[in-house]
């Protein structure tokens, strides 16, 4: 059995029904376009929505978007842990990160700390593009085993920082 997490008001894992999730393909800082797309996806049955947060403008749009939508919002963070911190301060419902590409352990700890304080779950997303070079070499490329080992290493890192509201996406 998996652990039940709350992404906003939607239960994920732990025997909860499978939730329908999608991701916007708009520029997140184009609030009007992003909100319009979220409303269309919600009308089609989407229960949780994810947006890319590649820069500060996108992070600053999070609270404006949340004011206008009814479903939980996940911020997809790459490379800059400060964007995760900004989104957490702006009321994001969950974060999607790859701890291996947002900086060193102190940066991961900062994200884990704010997420623990604000009850924000973290989705660990691992894919072939983010797979560590050492694991590619160990397994001879991108393999299921390499992806699982990477994800579990990230889980252990977050656990070291007393964080366990984790969803894994491989």
Per-region residue spans from a language model:
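Alpha/beta enzyme core
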Residues: 2-51, 55-75, 79-170
């Amino acid at each position: 059995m998996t652990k039940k997490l709350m992404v906003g008001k939607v239960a994920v894992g732990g025997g909860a029904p499978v939730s329908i999730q999608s991701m916007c393909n708009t520029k997140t800082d184009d609030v009007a376009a992003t909100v319009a797309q979220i409303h269309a996806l919600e009308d089609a049955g989407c229960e949780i929505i994810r947006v890319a947060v590649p820069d500060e403008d996108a992070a600053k749009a999070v609270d404006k978007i949340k004011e206008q939508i009814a479903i939980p919002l996940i911020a997809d963070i790459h490379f800059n842990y400060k964007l995760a911190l900004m989104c957490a301060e702006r009321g994001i419902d969950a974060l999607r990160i790859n701890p291996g590409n947002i900086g060193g352990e102190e940066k991961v700890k900062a994200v884990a700390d704010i997420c623990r304080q604000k009850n924000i779950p973290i989705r660990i997303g691992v894919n072939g593009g983010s797979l560590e070079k050492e694991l590619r070499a160990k397994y001879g490329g991108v393999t299921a085993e390499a992806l699982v080992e990477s994800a579990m290493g990230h889980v252990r890192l977050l656990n070291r920082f007393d964080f366990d509201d984790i969803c894994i996406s491989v």
